[in-house]
């Protein structure tokens, strides 16, 4: 699966994750996501309310990634935001 990073994701990643202990974990979990986006360990789920139409998966206990799938073939995921539960929801 192809992954793209939105400008808002890149900004949030630099601010909230880069140069922390979570950065290496993020890249490992992203590999898992690319192989199977619905792996049980990721806890991938649809969002509701103001984030309806988006999905989320868990990187660590309190680190989430918000994303959506494009209708392209092959499937492509666009990562929109990353942060704690309170930061992204």
Describe every region a protein language model picked out.
Residues 1-29:
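Arg/Lys-rich, positively charged N-terminal/basic patches that mediate binding to nucleic acids
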Residues 2, 8-14, 58-89:
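Enriched for short, Lys/Arg-rich terminal
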Residues 18, 26, 43-50, 64, ...:
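Flexible domain-boundary/linker segments
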Residues 23-32, 77, 82:
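Short, charge- and proline-biased low-complexity linear segments
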Residues 30, 36, 86-89:
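A short, hydrophobic secondary-structure junction motif
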